[in-house]
Protein backbone atom coordinates (compact mmCIF):
# COMPACT_ATOMS: atom_id res chain seq x y z
CA UNK A 1 0.00 0.00 0.00
CA UNK A 2 1.61 3.25 -1.16
CA UNK A 3 1.39 6.16 1.28
CA UNK A 4 3.87 8.72 -0.09
CA UNK A 5 3.56 11.53 -2.59
CA UNK A 6 4.41 10.69 -6.19
CA UNK A 7 6.56 13.40 -7.77
CA UNK A 8 8.78 13.19 -10.85
CA UNK A 9 8.48 9.42 -11.10
CA UNK A 10 9.28 8.63 -7.47
CA UNK A 11 7.39 8.05 -4.23
CA UNK A 12 8.66 10.59 -1.71
CA UNK A 13 7.84 11.94 1.74
CA UNK A 14 6.41 15.42 2.11
CA UNK A 15 9.01 18.17 2.40
CA UNK A 16 7.94 18.93 5.97
CA UNK A 17 7.39 15.22 6.77
CA UNK A 18 3.73 15.93 7.53
CA UNK A 19 1.23 13.06 7.52
CA UNK A 20 -2.53 12.53 7.53
CA UNK A 21 -4.46 9.68 9.15
CA UNK A 22 -6.60 7.62 6.77
CA UNK A 23 -9.51 6.05 8.65
CA UNK A 24 -11.70 3.03 7.97
CA UNK A 25 -15.32 4.28 7.75
CA UNK A 26 -16.60 0.91 8.92
CA UNK A 27 -15.24 1.32 12.45
CA UNK A 28 -13.16 4.51 12.59
CA UNK A 29 -9.91 2.58 12.94
CA UNK A 30 -6.63 3.74 11.42
CA UNK A 31 -5.86 2.19 8.03
CA UNK A 32 -2.57 4.01 7.50
CA UNK A 33 -0.87 7.38 7.50
CA UNK A 34 -0.17 9.13 4.21
CA UNK A 35 2.23 11.94 3.37
CA UNK A 36 0.52 15.33 3.49
CA UNK A 37 1.50 17.57 0.59
CA UNK A 38 2.21 21.20 1.43
CA UNK A 39 2.52 24.15 -0.93
CA UNK A 40 6.22 23.34 -1.29
CA UNK A 41 5.41 19.82 -2.48
CA UNK A 42 2.90 21.15 -5.00
CA UNK A 43 5.60 23.48 -6.32
CA UNK A 44 7.94 20.52 -6.83
CA UNK A 45 5.20 18.56 -8.58
CA UNK A 46 4.41 21.45 -10.94
CA UNK A 47 8.11 21.85 -11.72
CA UNK A 48 8.32 18.14 -12.58
CA UNK A 49 5.23 18.32 -14.78
CA UNK A 50 6.62 21.42 -16.52
CA UNK A 51 9.89 19.64 -17.33
CA UNK A 52 8.02 16.60 -18.64
CA UNK A 53 5.56 18.52 -20.83
CA UNK A 54 7.69 19.18 -23.96
CA UNK A 55 8.58 15.52 -24.53
CA UNK A 56 5.16 14.17 -23.52
CA UNK A 57 3.24 16.56 -25.75
CA UNK A 58 5.61 15.82 -28.66
CA UNK A 59 5.19 12.06 -28.25
CA UNK A 60 3.07 10.61 -31.08
CA UNK A 61 -0.55 10.55 -29.96
CA UNK A 62 -0.72 6.84 -30.70
CA UNK A 63 2.10 6.26 -28.20
CA UNK A 64 0.28 8.20 -25.50
CA UNK A 65 -2.78 6.13 -26.30
CA UNK A 66 -0.79 2.90 -26.09
CA UNK A 67 0.29 3.72 -22.54
CA UNK A 68 -3.31 4.45 -21.51
CA UNK A 69 -4.41 1.14 -23.01
CA UNK A 70 -1.67 -0.66 -21.09
CA UNK A 71 -2.84 1.07 -17.92
CA UNK A 72 -6.41 -0.14 -18.53
CA UNK A 73 -5.09 -3.69 -18.87
CA UNK A 74 -3.07 -3.32 -15.65
CA UNK A 75 -6.14 -2.10 -13.77
CA UNK A 76 -8.07 -5.17 -14.88
CA UNK A 77 -5.17 -7.43 -13.93
CA UNK A 78 -5.21 -5.91 -10.42
CA UNK A 79 -8.98 -5.55 -10.20
CA UNK A 80 -9.56 -7.37 -6.92
CA UNK A 81 -6.81 -5.48 -5.10
CA UNK A 82 -8.20 -2.15 -6.31
CA UNK A 83 -11.76 -3.10 -5.37
CA UNK A 84 -10.70 -4.10 -1.86
CA UNK A 85 -8.70 -0.89 -1.46
CA UNK A 86 -11.59 1.28 -2.67
CA UNK A 87 -14.12 -0.36 -0.36
CA UNK A 88 -11.79 -0.25 2.65
CA UNK A 89 -11.04 3.44 2.13
CA UNK A 90 -14.41 4.83 0.98
CA UNK A 91 -17.06 2.48 2.36
CA UNK A 92 -18.33 1.45 -1.08
CA UNK A 93 -19.93 -2.00 -0.87
CA UNK A 94 -17.40 -4.45 -2.29
CA UNK A 95 -19.93 -5.75 -4.79
CA UNK A 96 -20.15 -2.24 -6.28
CA UNK A 97 -16.39 -1.72 -6.27
CA UNK A 98 -15.98 -4.99 -8.15
CA UNK A 99 -18.82 -4.59 -10.63
CA UNK A 100 -18.82 -0.80 -11.16
CA UNK A 101 -15.88 1.23 -9.86
CA UNK A 102 -12.98 -0.85 -11.16
CA UNK A 103 -14.51 -1.80 -14.55
CA UNK A 104 -15.58 1.79 -15.19
CA UNK A 105 -12.11 3.06 -14.31
CA UNK A 106 -10.48 0.67 -16.76
CA UNK A 107 -13.08 1.49 -19.42
CA UNK A 108 -12.44 5.22 -19.11
CA UNK A 109 -8.68 4.92 -19.50
CA UNK A 110 -9.23 2.53 -22.42
CA UNK A 111 -11.64 4.92 -24.12
CA UNK A 112 -9.20 7.83 -23.97
CA UNK A 113 -6.37 5.53 -24.98
CA UNK A 114 -8.30 4.93 -28.17
CA UNK A 115 -9.22 8.60 -28.46
CA UNK A 116 -5.65 9.92 -28.24
CA UNK A 117 -4.87 9.77 -31.98
CA UNK A 118 -8.37 10.74 -33.10
CA UNK A 119 -8.40 14.34 -31.95
CA UNK A 120 -8.74 16.18 -35.25
CA UNK A 121 -8.29 19.75 -36.29
CA UNK A 122 -10.16 21.52 -39.07
CA UNK A 123 -9.69 23.58 -42.21
CA UNK A 124 -11.61 26.85 -42.45
CA UNK A 125 -12.78 28.18 -45.84
CA UNK A 126 -11.26 31.64 -46.18
CA UNK A 127 -10.47 34.05 -49.01
CA UNK A 128 -8.65 32.90 -52.15
CA UNK A 129 -4.90 32.67 -51.79
CA UNK A 130 -4.91 31.71 -48.14
CA UNK A 131 -5.20 28.50 -46.15
CA UNK A 132 -6.43 28.53 -42.56
CA UNK A 133 -6.28 25.42 -40.43
CA UNK A 134 -6.97 24.86 -36.73
CA UNK A 135 -4.95 22.54 -34.52
CA UNK A 136 -5.88 21.28 -31.06
CA UNK A 137 -2.91 21.91 -28.78
CA UNK A 138 -2.59 20.71 -25.16
CA UNK A 139 -3.01 23.30 -22.43
CA UNK A 140 0.24 22.35 -20.67
CA UNK A 141 0.41 21.50 -16.97
CA UNK A 142 -3.05 20.86 -15.57
CA UNK A 143 -4.04 20.66 -11.92
CA UNK A 144 -6.78 18.25 -10.93
CA UNK A 145 -8.59 17.87 -7.61
CA UNK A 146 -10.51 14.64 -7.03
CA UNK A 147 -13.23 14.25 -4.36
CA UNK A 148 -13.61 11.54 -1.75
CA UNK A 149 -16.79 9.85 -2.98
CA UNK A 150 -15.54 8.09 -6.15
CA UNK A 151 -11.74 8.49 -6.07
CA UNK A 152 -10.97 5.61 -8.42
CA UNK A 153 -13.40 6.57 -11.17
CA UNK A 154 -12.81 10.31 -10.93
CA UNK A 155 -9.07 9.78 -11.24
CA UNK A 156 -9.68 8.15 -14.62
CA UNK A 157 -12.27 10.74 -15.67
CA UNK A 158 -9.78 13.53 -15.09
CA UNK A 159 -6.45 12.01 -16.06
CA UNK A 160 -7.68 10.09 -19.12
CA UNK A 161 -8.56 13.01 -21.41
CA UNK A 162 -5.82 15.27 -20.04
CA UNK A 163 -3.06 12.75 -20.78
CA UNK A 164 -4.50 11.66 -24.11
CA UNK A 165 -4.51 15.28 -25.27
CA UNK A 166 -0.82 15.68 -24.37
CA UNK A 167 -0.98 17.51 -21.04
CA UNK A 168 1.00 16.67 -17.94
CA UNK A 169 -0.82 16.34 -14.63
CA UNK A 170 -0.58 17.28 -10.97
CA UNK A 171 -3.51 15.60 -9.22
CA UNK A 172 -4.61 16.04 -5.62
CA UNK A 173 -6.80 13.22 -4.34
CA UNK A 174 -8.88 13.80 -1.24
CA UNK A 175 -6.95 13.39 1.98
CA UNK A 176 -9.85 11.21 3.17
CA UNK A 177 -9.70 8.60 0.37
CA UNK A 178 -6.31 8.73 -1.39
CA UNK A 179 -5.34 5.07 -1.45
CA UNK A 180 -6.74 3.85 -4.77
CA UNK A 181 -5.33 6.86 -6.63
CA UNK A 182 -1.87 6.15 -5.23
CA UNK A 183 -2.16 2.56 -6.42
CA UNK A 184 -3.21 3.75 -9.88
CA UNK A 185 -0.12 5.94 -10.24
CA UNK A 186 2.03 3.03 -9.12
CA UNK A 187 0.55 1.00 -11.99
CA UNK A 188 1.21 3.92 -14.35
CA UNK A 189 4.89 3.82 -13.46
CA UNK A 190 4.94 0.06 -14.00
CA UNK A 191 3.46 0.27 -17.51
CA UNK A 192 5.95 2.92 -18.60
CA UNK A 193 4.58 6.43 -18.16
CA UNK A 194 7.58 8.81 -18.24
CA UNK A 195 8.79 10.58 -15.12
CA UNK A 196 6.97 13.81 -14.32
CA UNK A 197 4.00 13.20 -16.61
CA UNK A 198 1.74 12.36 -13.66
CA UNK A 199 2.31 13.64 -10.12
CA UNK A 200 0.06 12.83 -7.13
CA UNK A 201 -0.05 15.16 -4.11
CA UNK A 202 -2.61 14.10 -1.49
CA UNK A 203 -3.14 16.82 1.06
CA UNK A 204 -5.58 19.24 2.60
CA UNK A 205 -7.61 21.57 0.44
CA UNK A 206 -6.55 24.74 2.24
CA UNK A 207 -2.86 23.98 1.63
CA UNK A 208 -2.19 21.66 -1.32
CA UNK A 209 -5.47 22.41 -3.08
CA UNK A 210 -5.11 26.15 -2.61
CA UNK A 211 -1.57 26.17 -3.99
CA UNK A 212 -2.53 24.04 -6.99
CA UNK A 213 -5.41 26.37 -7.84
CA UNK A 214 -3.32 29.53 -7.56
CA UNK A 215 -0.06 28.22 -9.04
CA UNK A 216 1.12 30.40 -11.95
CA UNK A 217 2.64 27.38 -13.69
CA UNK A 218 -0.69 25.55 -13.96
CA UNK A 219 -2.63 26.28 -17.15
CA UNK A 220 -5.91 24.68 -16.13
CA UNK A 221 -7.53 23.49 -12.91
CA UNK A 222 -10.23 20.82 -12.93
CA UNK A 223 -12.16 20.37 -9.69
CA UNK A 224 -14.93 18.07 -8.52
CA UNK A 225 -16.52 18.84 -5.15
CA UNK A 226 -18.85 21.21 -3.37
CA UNK A 227 -20.14 24.45 -4.84
CA UNK A 228 -18.68 26.44 -1.93
CA UNK A 229 -15.19 25.05 -2.56
CA UNK A 230 -15.66 25.58 -6.29
CA UNK A 231 -16.08 29.30 -5.67
CA UNK A 232 -12.80 29.36 -3.75
CA UNK A 233 -11.08 27.51 -6.61
CA UNK A 234 -12.25 30.18 -9.06
CA UNK A 235 -10.99 32.97 -6.79
CA UNK A 236 -7.62 31.30 -6.29
CA UNK A 237 -7.17 30.68 -10.02
CA UNK A 238 -7.52 34.31 -11.05
CA UNK A 239 -3.85 35.21 -10.60
CA UNK A 240 -2.78 33.80 -13.97
CA UNK A 241 -6.28 33.60 -15.52
CA UNK A 242 -5.99 29.83 -15.81
CA UNK A 243 -8.82 27.84 -17.31
CA UNK A 244 -11.20 26.32 -14.78
CA UNK A 245 -13.45 23.28 -15.05
CA UNK A 246 -15.93 22.65 -12.23
CA UNK A 247 -18.17 19.69 -11.47
CA UNK A 248 -20.02 20.73 -8.33
CA UNK A 249 -23.11 19.96 -6.28
CA UNK A 250 -26.49 18.72 -7.37
CA UNK A 251 -30.05 18.22 -6.22
CA UNK A 252 -31.34 15.90 -8.91
CA UNK A 253 -35.08 15.79 -9.60
CA UNK A 254 -36.35 12.30 -10.41
CA UNK A 255 -39.88 12.76 -11.81
CA UNK A 256 -42.36 9.87 -11.93
CA UNK A 257 -45.39 10.59 -14.11
CA UNK A 258 -48.71 8.80 -13.67
CA UNK A 259 -48.20 6.60 -16.75
CA UNK A 260 -44.78 5.31 -15.66
CA UNK A 261 -43.83 1.66 -15.32
CA UNK A 262 -43.90 1.66 -11.52
CA UNK A 263 -41.82 -1.48 -11.12
CA UNK A 264 -39.00 0.07 -13.14
CA UNK A 265 -39.41 3.50 -11.55
CA UNK A 266 -39.27 2.15 -8.00
CA UNK A 267 -36.12 0.16 -8.69
CA UNK A 268 -34.60 3.08 -10.57
CA UNK A 269 -35.42 5.60 -7.85
CA UNK A 270 -33.80 3.39 -5.21
CA UNK A 271 -30.66 3.05 -7.32
CA UNK A 272 -30.67 6.80 -7.97
CA UNK A 273 -30.39 7.73 -4.29
CA UNK A 274 -29.12 4.77 -2.29
CA UNK A 275 -26.21 3.65 -4.49
CA UNK A 276 -22.97 4.61 -2.72
CA UNK A 277 -25.04 5.77 0.26
CA UNK A 278 -26.32 8.73 -1.75
CA UNK A 279 -22.83 10.22 -1.91
CA UNK A 280 -23.08 11.22 -5.55
CA UNK A 281 -23.47 14.66 -7.07
CA UNK A 282 -25.95 13.23 -9.59
CA UNK A 283 -28.05 11.38 -7.00
CA UNK A 284 -31.81 11.50 -7.54
CA UNK A 285 -32.31 13.18 -4.19
CA UNK A 286 -35.69 14.74 -5.02
CA UNK A 287 -38.38 12.18 -5.84
CA UNK A 288 -41.14 14.09 -7.63
CA UNK A 289 -44.31 11.96 -7.79
CA UNK A 290 -47.57 12.48 -9.64
CA UNK A 291 -50.32 12.69 -7.05
CA UNK A 292 -52.33 9.87 -8.69
CA UNK A 293 -49.61 7.28 -8.14
CA UNK A 294 -47.79 8.79 -5.15
CA UNK A 295 -49.39 6.72 -2.38
CA UNK A 296 -48.89 3.37 -4.12
CA UNK A 297 -45.38 4.33 -5.16
CA UNK A 298 -44.37 5.41 -1.67
CA UNK A 299 -45.76 2.32 0.00
CA UNK A 300 -43.64 0.10 -2.22
CA UNK A 301 -40.63 2.40 -2.29
CA UNK A 302 -40.46 2.76 1.49
CA UNK A 303 -40.72 -1.01 1.83
CA UNK A 304 -37.80 -1.45 -0.56
CA UNK A 305 -35.70 1.23 1.17
CA UNK A 306 -36.32 -0.34 4.57
CA UNK A 307 -35.13 -3.72 3.30
CA UNK A 308 -31.75 -2.56 1.97
CA UNK A 309 -28.95 -4.42 3.74
CA UNK A 310 -26.63 -1.95 5.47
CA UNK A 311 -23.34 -3.49 6.53
CA UNK A 312 -19.57 -3.82 6.43
CA UNK A 313 -18.54 -2.76 2.93
CA UNK A 314 -16.24 -5.77 2.64
CA UNK A 315 -19.20 -8.11 3.17
CA UNK A 316 -20.36 -9.32 -0.28
CA UNK A 317 -23.97 -9.28 0.96
CA UNK A 318 -23.90 -5.61 2.01
CA UNK A 319 -25.98 -3.39 -0.28
CA UNK A 320 -25.12 -0.11 1.43
CA UNK A 321 -21.99 0.73 3.40
CA UNK A 322 -21.06 3.58 5.74
CA UNK A 323 -20.71 7.23 4.86
CA UNK A 324 -17.10 8.12 4.20
CA UNK A 325 -16.31 10.19 7.29
CA UNK A 326 -17.61 10.97 10.78
CA UNK A 327 -17.79 14.67 9.94
CA UNK A 328 -19.99 13.94 6.96
CA UNK A 329 -22.23 11.57 8.95
CA UNK A 330 -22.88 14.29 11.53
CA UNK A 331 -23.76 16.77 8.79
CA UNK A 332 -26.15 14.37 7.05
CA UNK A 333 -28.01 13.53 10.27
CA UNK A 334 -28.65 17.22 11.01
CA UNK A 335 -31.01 17.28 8.03
CA UNK A 336 -33.45 14.97 9.84
CA UNK A 337 -34.11 17.67 12.42
CA UNK A 338 -34.11 20.35 9.73
CA UNK A 339 -36.82 18.46 7.84
CA UNK A 340 -38.96 17.91 10.92
CA UNK A 341 -38.69 21.55 11.95
CA UNK A 342 -40.10 22.54 8.56
CA UNK A 343 -42.99 20.08 8.71
CA UNK A 344 -41.43 17.17 6.84
CA UNK A 345 -42.47 13.56 7.53
CA UNK A 346 -39.80 10.89 7.99
CA UNK A 347 -41.28 7.81 6.31
CA UNK A 348 -38.33 5.54 7.07
CA UNK A 349 -34.75 5.82 8.31
CA UNK A 350 -33.27 9.02 9.66
CA UNK A 351 -30.95 7.34 12.15
CA UNK A 352 -28.09 4.88 12.52
CA UNK A 353 -28.92 1.18 12.13
CA UNK A 354 -29.53 -0.74 15.36
CA UNK A 355 -26.68 -3.19 14.87
CA UNK A 356 -23.90 -3.43 17.43
CA UNK A 357 -21.48 -4.62 14.74
CA UNK A 358 -21.86 -1.26 13.02
CA UNK A 359 -21.88 0.96 16.11
CA UNK A 360 -18.37 2.38 15.62
CA UNK A 361 -18.86 3.12 11.94
CA UNK A 362 -20.36 6.03 10.02
CA UNK A 363 -23.62 4.34 9.14
CA UNK A 364 -27.08 5.73 8.50
CA UNK A 365 -30.22 3.96 7.34
CA UNK A 366 -31.82 4.64 3.96
CA UNK A 367 -34.07 7.62 4.61
CA UNK A 368 -37.24 8.80 2.89
CA UNK A 369 -38.68 12.20 3.89
CA UNK A 370 -41.80 13.81 2.46
CA UNK A 371 -41.34 17.56 2.39
CA UNK A 372 -44.09 20.05 3.01
CA UNK A 373 -42.92 22.37 0.24
CA UNK A 374 -40.45 22.43 -2.65
CA UNK A 375 -38.88 25.46 -0.97
CA UNK A 376 -37.99 23.55 2.22
CA UNK A 377 -34.28 23.23 2.96
CA UNK A 378 -34.45 19.45 2.59
CA UNK A 379 -35.71 20.01 -0.97
CA UNK A 380 -33.21 22.74 -1.82
CA UNK A 381 -29.87 21.88 -0.20
CA UNK A 382 -27.57 19.03 -1.14
CA UNK A 383 -27.51 16.46 1.67
CA UNK A 384 -25.10 14.07 -0.06
CA UNK A 385 -26.36 11.02 1.77
CA UNK A 386 -29.01 8.29 1.49
CA UNK A 387 -31.77 10.87 2.02
CA UNK A 388 -34.47 11.28 -0.60
CA UNK A 389 -37.00 14.11 -0.43
CA UNK A 390 -40.50 13.36 -1.74
CA UNK A 391 -42.59 16.03 -3.45
CA UNK A 392 -45.96 15.68 -5.20
CA UNK A 393 -47.29 17.32 -8.36
CA UNK A 394 -50.53 17.42 -10.31
CA UNK A 395 -49.53 18.61 -13.78
CA UNK A 396 -46.56 18.43 -16.13
CA UNK A 397 -46.00 22.15 -15.67
CA UNK A 398 -45.88 21.78 -11.90
CA UNK A 399 -43.40 18.91 -12.16
CA UNK A 400 -41.14 21.00 -14.36
CA UNK A 401 -41.39 23.97 -12.00
CA UNK A 402 -40.34 21.77 -9.07
CA UNK A 403 -37.46 20.28 -11.05
CA UNK A 404 -36.14 23.74 -11.91
CA UNK A 405 -36.67 25.27 -8.47
CA UNK A 406 -33.13 24.80 -7.09
CA UNK A 407 -29.86 26.57 -7.82
CA UNK A 408 -28.34 23.33 -9.11
CA UNK A 409 -28.43 21.85 -12.60
CA UNK A 410 -26.47 18.60 -12.80
CA UNK A 411 -28.49 15.37 -13.12
CA UNK A 412 -32.21 14.74 -13.58
CA UNK A 413 -34.52 11.89 -14.48
CA UNK A 414 -38.06 11.16 -15.57
CA UNK A 415 -40.26 8.11 -15.90
CA UNK A 416 -43.07 7.95 -18.45
CA UNK A 417 -44.39 5.85 -21.33
CA UNK A 418 -45.30 8.99 -23.29
CA UNK A 419 -42.52 9.63 -25.81
CA UNK A 420 -43.61 13.19 -26.55
CA UNK A 421 -43.79 14.09 -22.85
CA UNK A 422 -40.40 12.50 -22.24
CA UNK A 423 -38.54 14.50 -24.87
CA UNK A 424 -40.39 17.73 -24.14
CA UNK A 425 -39.69 17.54 -20.41
CA UNK A 426 -36.06 16.51 -20.89
CA UNK A 427 -35.46 19.55 -23.10
CA UNK A 428 -36.96 21.90 -20.50
CA UNK A 429 -35.24 20.64 -17.35
CA UNK A 430 -32.39 22.94 -16.42
CA UNK A 431 -29.70 20.30 -16.06
CA UNK A 432 -26.60 19.11 -17.86
CA UNK A 433 -27.90 15.53 -17.97
CA UNK A 434 -31.31 13.88 -18.08
CA UNK A 435 -32.12 10.18 -17.91
CA UNK A 436 -35.42 8.91 -19.32
CA UNK A 437 -36.74 5.68 -17.77
CA UNK A 438 -33.35 5.10 -16.15
CA UNK A 439 -30.99 6.98 -13.84
CA UNK A 440 -27.24 7.47 -13.24
CA UNK A 441 -26.13 5.93 -16.51
CA UNK A 442 -22.58 6.99 -17.44
CA UNK A 443 -20.25 6.07 -20.28
CA UNK A 444 -16.78 7.35 -21.22
CA UNK A 445 -18.12 8.57 -24.55
CA UNK A 446 -20.96 10.61 -23.06
CA UNK A 447 -20.28 14.12 -21.70
CA UNK A 448 -20.85 14.55 -17.97
CA UNK A 449 -21.38 17.90 -16.27
CA UNK A 450 -23.80 20.55 -15.14
CA UNK A 451 -25.07 24.09 -15.50
CA UNK A 452 -25.67 26.92 -13.06
CA UNK A 453 -24.19 26.32 -9.62
CA UNK A 454 -23.42 22.73 -10.57
CA UNK A 455 -20.43 24.03 -12.51
CA UNK A 456 -19.21 24.21 -16.09
CA UNK A 457 -17.06 22.19 -18.46
CA UNK A 458 -17.49 18.50 -19.17
CA UNK A 459 -15.92 15.23 -18.15
CA UNK A 460 -15.63 12.40 -20.71
CA UNK A 461 -16.39 12.26 -24.40
CA UNK A 462 -14.96 14.50 -27.14
CA UNK A 463 -16.02 17.47 -25.03
CA UNK A 464 -13.50 16.50 -22.35
CA UNK A 465 -10.69 16.21 -24.89
CA UNK A 466 -11.53 19.66 -26.23
CA UNK A 467 -11.63 21.04 -22.69
CA UNK A 468 -7.99 19.95 -22.26
CA UNK A 469 -6.83 21.62 -25.47
CA UNK A 470 -6.51 25.07 -26.98
CA UNK A 471 -7.53 25.91 -30.54
CA UNK A 472 -4.49 27.13 -32.48
CA UNK A 473 -5.34 28.94 -35.71
CA UNK A 474 -2.67 28.86 -38.45
CA UNK A 475 -2.83 31.07 -41.55
CA UNK A 476 -0.82 30.29 -44.69
CA UNK A 477 -0.26 32.66 -47.58
CA UNK A 478 -0.40 30.12 -50.40
CA UNK A 479 1.28 32.11 -53.19
CA UNK A 480 3.62 34.05 -50.91
CA UNK A 481 2.92 37.48 -52.37
CA UNK A 482 2.06 40.39 -50.09
CA UNK A 483 0.69 43.47 -51.87
CA UNK A 484 1.99 46.72 -50.39
CA UNK A 485 -0.36 48.36 -47.95
CA UNK A 486 1.91 51.34 -47.50
CA UNK A 487 2.64 52.29 -51.08
CA UNK A 488 5.82 54.15 -51.83
Predicted regions mapped to residue ranges:
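Conserved C-terminal structural/oligomerization subdomain of aldehyde/semialdehyde dehydrogenase
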Residues: 27-33, 218, 255, 309, ...
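Residue-level signal for inorganic ion chemistry
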Residues: 28, 64, 86, 109, ...
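Hydrophobic face of amphipathic alpha-helices that form TPR/SEL1-like repeat modules
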Residues: 1-27
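Structural signal for hydrophobic packing residues in well-ordered secondary-structure cores
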Residues: 53, 57, 72-79, 83, ...
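ALDH superfamily catalytic-core signature
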Residues: 220, 228-373, 436, 483-487
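A structural signal for short, well-ordered beta-strand elements
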Residues: 21, 35, 57-58, 258, ...
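Rossmann-like NAD(P) dinucleotide-binding subdomain of oxidoreductase/dehydrogenase enzymes
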Residues: 120-264, 393
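Glycine-rich loop-to-alpha-helix module at the N-terminal edge of alpha/beta enzyme cores
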Residues: 31-119
Amino acid sequence: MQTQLFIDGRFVDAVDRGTIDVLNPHDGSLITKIAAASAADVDLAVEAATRAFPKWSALPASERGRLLLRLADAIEANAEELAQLESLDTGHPIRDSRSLDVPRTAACFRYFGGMADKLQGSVIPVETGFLNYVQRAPVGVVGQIVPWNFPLMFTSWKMGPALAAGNTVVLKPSEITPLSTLRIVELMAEVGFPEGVVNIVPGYGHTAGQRLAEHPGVGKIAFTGSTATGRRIVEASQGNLKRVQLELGGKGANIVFDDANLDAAINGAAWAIFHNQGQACIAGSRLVLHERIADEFLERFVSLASSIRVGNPLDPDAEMGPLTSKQHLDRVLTFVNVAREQGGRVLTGGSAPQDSALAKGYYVRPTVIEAKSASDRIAQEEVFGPFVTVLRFGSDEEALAIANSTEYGLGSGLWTRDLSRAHKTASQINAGMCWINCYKRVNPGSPFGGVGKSGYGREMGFEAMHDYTEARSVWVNVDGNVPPHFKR
